Every structure is written in structure tokens, then in C-alpha cells.
Amino acid sequence: MTPEGRALLLAGAAELGLELSAEHLDRFARLLVRLTEGSAQLNLTALHQERDIVLKHFVDSLTCLRGGWLDGAARVLDLGTGAGFPALPLAIVRPDLQLVALDATRKKVDFVERTARSLELNHVQPLTGRAETLGRDPAQRESYDRVVTRAVAALPILAELTLPFLRMGGFLLAQKGPIGPEELEAGTRAAQEVGGEIRAIDAFVLPVAGDARTLVVVEKTAPTPERYPRREGVPNRKPLFWRAT
């Protein structure tokens, strides 16, 4: 990582109230190398410039720490982790969390597993599979304190895919861009349908970059009905209470 990239990372983290140590910076620098090399072979990310990766992957991943919603959590699921975001940046700064990085694409999960091992992030567990299937698995259902997602899907889809994984009193932290009123209304109804209530809608700008972001927090307040999640592909094709235009 160049001095400019390091400065951007430090500035972005500082805006989030995080003070990065030399060990943190070393791991982020190694993650940058791993991502750049891996993406050239596996097409892991559309971002290739150091500035974009630092701000729009590393710093953006850390914005789920806003508001302290991860405080007190032990077991956290990153649903739709892709190349490991937000799981890997979170693992670097929060070694107290047991992070499970879930994606349906084997090559991405393999990359996350190799990278976590390379960075000595032993508290990251890779998991390959579909949320619709694993959300019905007794070993996974209602077994997490938090679920984090980053730019995965519309809120009604997220509610159905994520709430089944949460214990009672757990929280979904959905990292998204701007949310329109129709998506928010449908997301509110979908959350209630599957056992949740929206507790916070935190609109902010991405540190340094200035892009609009939203952190939606949903609490698991009731058991998810057994019929959810619906079978594979249905939540995306027929979102609850939502017709995307």
C-alpha cells in the first residue's frame, strides 16, 4: 500500500472513530495485495485503483461499526460476502468477533478462506451455500447475534434471507446506498412478516469519498415463520411486498 493509500485508510477510519495500529495497517496492506492479485485471476471486484479499493471496500466495510450495533455480539454472519467484504476488514479491526463469511460462489469463498489464513485471521470461517437453504438448516437457523450485508439486495429480499439466521434480539445491519420510500415501506413490511422490526435508518456519507450510504438496522423480535425463507431463487424473483421497477 502506498503512503497515499495508507493516509486515506487512516483518515477514513478516523472519521468512524477508529484508530488503526501498525498491525492493522500491515494486514490491510496485505489484503490489498491479495485482492489485487486474486481479482486479476478470479474477477473478484470491479474496483482496481488503490484509492477506490481503500475507500469503497475497506473503509466502506467498516461503516457497519457506526452506532455501536456490533457491540456485545459474538457470532456474526456476513451474508453475500463476495471477496470478503465486510468480513475481512471487520476481522482485522475486531478480533473479538467470530465471523462466518457466506457466499454461494465457491471461488469467492475459497479466496476468502485463503486470504483469512494468509492474514492469520483465524476467527473467520468460510461457508459456501445459498441463504435460502442454509436459513432452514438447524445448525444455522437462529444461531447468529448479527447478520451483516453489504450492497447485496433490496431491503425486502434482505429481510427474508437474513432474519431466519438471527437469534431473538439479534440485529441485521444492512449496508446500502440511498433507499427510496417504496423500498423502505416494502422492507418494513417484509421485516415484520419474517419476525423483525426496523430500529434505525442511518443515512450518512462515506468517509473521504463522500458517496451516499445508508445503514439499516433490523432487530429480530419474533421467531421467523417456518415457511421462510422460501425456496431457492424465489425471494429474489418475488420479493415480499415489493415490485422493483
UniProtKB/Swiss-Prot annotation:
EC number annotated for this UniProt entry: 2.1.1.-
Enzyme class, spelled out: transferase
Matches recorded under Gene3D superfamilies: Vaccinia Virus protein VP39 (3.40.50.150)
Location, primary (coarse class): cytoplasm
Cellular location(s): Cytoplasm
Molecular function terms, GO-annotated: rRNA (guanine-N7-)-methyltransferase activity
A Pfam family that the UniProt record links to this protein: GidB
InterPro entries: rRNA_ssu_MeTfrase_G, SAM-dependent_MTases_sf
Family membership: Belongs to the methyltransferase superfamily. RNA methyltransferase RsmG family.
PANTHER family: S-ADENOSYL-L-METHIONINE-DEPENDENT METHYLTRANSFERASES SUPERFAMILY PROTEIN
Protein's name according to its UniProt entry: Ribosomal RNA small subunit methyltransferase G
Lineage of origin: Bacteria, Thermotogati, Deinococcota, Deinococci, Deinococcales
